[in-house]
Every structure is written in structure tokens, then in C-alpha cells.
Amino acid sequence: IADQAETTDILCTHPYPLFTPHCRIDPVNTMRNAFHAAAETRLYGDVGNVPAFVEEAGSLGPCLSSERVAADYLRNMLWNSYAHDCRGLLWWCGHDQTELPHTPYDWVGMERCLGLLRTDRSPKPVMEELGKFGRMAAKLPLPAFRRDAVCILSQHQDQWGVGYLSFLLAKQAGFDIEFQYADQPLKPSKFYLLPSVTGTWVISRHRWMELLHAVEEGAVL
């Protein structure tokens, strides 16, 4: 993530629960998946230190959810992404593709019914939710997103899994976190998390001493 951010002005995510570890174990419109897009996009933006947005999201069609559930899922994803300073969200895709005979629509049934519009061009509930949210967001700008703690993702761990579940647990505990890798300069904070350390290669000595100094100055680890 950090390497990519050095060469691009913005980072983007494709947060599909079905294809993402730690997400494909709950129904679509439940807490874990409602926060997936926001958590992954904040991880990219925080670690990369650049703006990030949800460049492609969707329900993957009726094989995973009804049209109404997909709309509820999108509404949660929009609100959570907006509240967490994710800079935009694009839904895949514009139209259902039930009449196309070529690949990937011939190969994979899941690809045929992903649109905001049905084949007859009638709008699905997801399109209505997208329109309602866009009109609301234009009238309701939010203040700067406040973070209460820095979550340090250490070396030789499942950084996405640890970061994602730390994000969810922090939400349930009533605070918000900012991400960084252990090999990045320590972000200033009064509250640090160093969750789920594993193995013998966790954090460099100089970064650890920097963290201990922050604790001596009053921060909580």
C-alpha cells in the first residue's frame, strides 16, 4: 500500500465481501460487511497517507442478496464511507447484462445482474438509495473525521485481518482508529494499539523505544 501511494495521488479499493478474507462469513447486510468498505479504504488512505475512495463496490447480484437487501447494504456502506472520510463510492455497474452472449456473461451467472438498472431499464432500489444519498450529501457536509487512537500493524502478522477486526472492535467500544505500519514514523496520539503481535519480528527497536517514550509522556498503549 505504502509503495503504491508513492506513485499515485489517490488509492482505491474494491471491497467485495465474497472475495475478501474475514468478510465472507456473515450475511451481506450485517455489521462486519457494512463496515468493510470504510475499514479497507481507511487502511489504504492511512497507510498510504493519501486520499482513498471506494472505486468499485456491489452486491454481486441475486446469488448473494435480494434487491432490497442490496439497497440496505449500499445505504450502510454509503453512510459509513462518508462518515470515515472515504472520498467517493462507485457502484458496479450501470446496467444488468442478461442478454449479452459473450464472456464473462456467458461464463459466470453472477456477472449478469449487477446493475443499478434492470435489463428493461427500470431502476432497482440500489439506484434510488444512491440518488437519495447523493442529494443528502450535497446539503450536509461533515466536519473533519476525528480519530481517537493509532492502530500499529506489526510485521509478520495478517495485517488486513488484524486491522479490520481492530476497527470493528474499536467501533463496538465507542472509538475510532487510524492505521499505520510498524515501520512507518510514529503518528502522534494519546492512545496506541499494538494488537495481535505474533512471531519474533514485530517492531524495530528504535520504533519500540519511540512508542515507550510516548507512553512516558502520557500516552496509553
Give residue spans per PLM region.
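Carbohydrate-binding surfaces of carbohydrate-active enzymes
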Residues: 38-39, 43-221
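Aromatic- and acid-rich polysaccharide-binding/catalytic face
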Residues: 1-34, 87, 191-196
